Amino acid sequence: MFRTMLNSKIHRATVTQADLHYVGSVTIDADLMAAADLLPGEQVTIVDINNGARLETYAISGPAGSGIIGINGAAARLVHPGDLVIIISYGIMDDAEARRHVPKVLFVDAENRIVGQGGDPAAALPGDPSSLRGDVLDPAGARGLGGGA
């Protein structure tokens, strides 16, 4: 059996530009692509934290060190400059490899510079009081997102 597993994610990247009339894709700073183990043309999922939009496209490399996260083509109707996004890649692997696999998890600042990295897909950025681990419940609804009983 093969499993589709998280290969990498760039967490809370800031969209720097959007171009509706570009042919398509997402332009990602080459340094971020390398750190996230992304290849040009690789399929990625983009999740917009601001509005909940979720879409699939492919990655293209932008200038290294530029911090660019550019939404191209029709996706520019869903994701806008200034939006926070999670860029996710998946890998297909056999069961044994999936059980050993450690994803690359990147945390970036407002300029899309790497400020933390690891291999725990549920991890929150250390020292960031505005985020919770993905495997922690918020039963009191303290985040204001409708949590609680």
Swiss-Prot record:
BP-aspect Gene Ontology terms: alanine biosynthetic process; pantothenate biosynthetic process
According to the record, cofactor stoichiometry and binding are noted as: Binds 1 pyruvoyl group covalently per subunit.
Predominant cellular place of this UniProt entry's protein: cytoplasm
Write out the residues that bind substrate.
Answer: T57, G73, A74, A75
What transmembrane ranges does the database entry give? none
Question: So which cofactors does this thing need?
Answer: pyruvate
In the record, which positions carry Pyruvic acid (Ser)? S25
**Protein location:** Cytoplasm
* Top-level taxon of origin: Bacteria
Q: How is it modified after translation?
A: Is synthesized initially as an inactive proenzyme, which is activated by self-cleavage at a specific serine bond to produce a beta-subunit with a hydroxyl group at its C-terminus and an alpha-subunit with a pyruvoyl group at its N-terminus.
* Cellular component annotations (GO), alphabetically ordered: cytosol
Pathway membership:
Cofactor biosynthesis; (R)-pantothenate biosynthesis; beta-alanine from L-aspartate: step 1/1
* Catalytic activity field: L-aspartate + H(+) = beta-alanine + CO2
- EC numbers listed for it are 4.1.1.11
> What molecular function terms (GO) are annotated for this protein?
aspartate 1-decarboxylase activity
Ranges for the region named Disordered are 119-149
Q: Where is the active site?
A: S25 (schiff-base intermediate with substrate), Y58 (proton donor)
Keywords attached to this Swiss-Prot or TrEMBL record, sorted alphabetically, are: Autocatalytic cleavage, Cytoplasm, Decarboxylase, Lyase, Pantothenate biosynthesis, Pyruvate, Schiff base, Zymogen
Q: How does it assemble?
A: Heterooctamer of four alpha and four beta subunits.
Q: Which family does it belong to?
A: Belongs to the PanD family.
Its annotated function is as follows: Catalyzes the pyruvoyl-dependent decarboxylation of aspartate to produce beta-alanine.
Protein name in the entry: Aspartate 1-decarboxylase
Which source organism?
Parafrankia sp. (strain EAN1pec)
